[in-house]
């Protein structure tokens, strides 16, 4: 197991609970004689912290562990910035669901200490890279840990598009949009649109139409190495939006093509040893508990 000596902290802004947890975490790490580096945005709201600061991008270069304090949205943003550096990332939940940030604030010291002592699990989560092309030229690019979504933006009209997978025509469709999700993102927007839950170790991508104008349209699970192309109908009069993790956005024009494929670099996600994916699903999604009388 790796020994962590340079630990970066990223915190969600605008939350007093996050600031309180960041302060606790900072003190705990300093007491263990670790070199602590704060992301510059959270450092700005912690006057007198007395620590080295860094941009989020640079944290990946100077740290051998980054701890994210916030919710899943905070982890999504951190993942896109840090995946290329292969730095392990650990999450402390100060959001609502916490699929990715799985350490509770009340167990911060215990669980972080275990991780620092080498008692942890590592998961490699792949990201998607999206590119919009206009007449063959790239006009917008973005990465996503959860999903790439084609949607009508502020318009209430349906989108007409064609879907190709690995160069093969799949279908033409009218729908409110299309979600292309990783296994990580299968419990997010894709789930609410009727997609399946995929275990994060699966090397697969799910394609989920949003309110399609045909009853036979269903989600498709494809190989994780597939290359997807979505052609926006040239006859459309609206300009659809592409969103990566609901955080990065760019605009398509009629006739543009959206290309989505697996990104080469993966997120190294750290969990405590007692992490259980099915327990997370059961807790976060409200699944039924075990029947009495069974071992």
From Swiss-Prot:
Function: Involved in the regulation of the intracellular balance of NAD and NADP, and is a key enzyme in the biosynthesis of NADP. Catalyzes specifically the phosphorylation on 2'-hydroxyl of the adenosine moiety of NAD to yield NADP.
EC number(s) recorded for this UniProt protein: 2.7.1.23
InterPro entries xrefs: ATP-NAD_kinase_N, ATP-NAD_kinase_PpnK-typ_C, NAD/diacylglycerol_kinase_sf, NADK
Subcellular location: Cytoplasm
Cofactor(s) for this UniProt protein: a divalent metal cation
Keywords assigned: ATP-binding, Cytoplasm, Kinase, NAD, NADP, Nucleotide-binding, Transferase
Catalytic activity: NAD(+) + ATP = ADP + NADP(+) + H(+)
UniProt-annotated catalytic positions: 72
Pfam (any one): NAD_kinase
Domain of life: Bacteria
GO CC term, one of those recorded: cytoplasm
GO MF, one annotated term: metal ion binding
Predominant place of localization: cytoplasm
Residues involved in NAD(+) binding: 72-73, 146-147, 157, 174, 176, 187-192, 247
Species in which this protein is naturally found: Ectopseudomonas mendocina (strain ymp)
Family indicated by similarity: Belongs to the NAD kinase family.
A biological process from GO: NAD metabolic process
UniProt protein name: NAD kinase
NCBIfam families: PRK01231.1
């Amino acid at each position: 197991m790796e020994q962590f000596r340079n630990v970066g902290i990223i915190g969600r802004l605008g939350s007093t609970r996050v600031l309180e947890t960041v302060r606790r975490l900072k003190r705990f790490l300093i007491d263990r004689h670790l070199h602590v580096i704060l992301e510059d945005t959270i450092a700005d709201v912690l006057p007198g912290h007395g620590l080295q600061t860094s941009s989020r991008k640079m944290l990946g270069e100077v740290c051998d562990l980054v701890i994210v304090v916030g919710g899943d949205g905070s982890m999504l943003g951190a993942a896109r910035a840090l995946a290329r550096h292969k730095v392990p990332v650990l999450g402390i939940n100060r959001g609502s669901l916490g699929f990715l940030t799985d350490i509770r604030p009340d167990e911060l010291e215990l669980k972080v200490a275990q991780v620092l002592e080498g008692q942890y699990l590592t998961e490699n989560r792949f990201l998607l890279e999206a590119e919009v092309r206009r007449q063959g030229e790239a006009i917008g690019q973005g990465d996503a840990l959860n999903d790439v979504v084609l949607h009508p933006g502020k318009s209430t009209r349906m989108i007409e598009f064609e879907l190709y997978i690995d160069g093969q025509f799949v279908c033409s469709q009218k729908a409110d949009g299309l979600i292309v999700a990783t296994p990580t993102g299968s419990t997010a927007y894709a789930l609410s649109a009727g997609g399946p839950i995929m275990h994060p170790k699966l090397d697969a991508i799910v394609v989920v139409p949003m309110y399609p104008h045909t009853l036979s349209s269903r989600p498709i699970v494809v190989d994780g190495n597939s290359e997807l192309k979505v052609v926006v109908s040239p006859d459309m009069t609206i300009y659809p939006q592409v969103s990566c993790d609901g955080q990065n956005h760019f605009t398509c024009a009629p006739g543009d093509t959206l290309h989505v494929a697996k990104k080469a670099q993966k997120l190294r996600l750290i969990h405590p040893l007692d992490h259980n994916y099915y327990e997370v699903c059961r807790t976060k999604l409200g699944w039924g508990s075990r029947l009495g009388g069974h071992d």
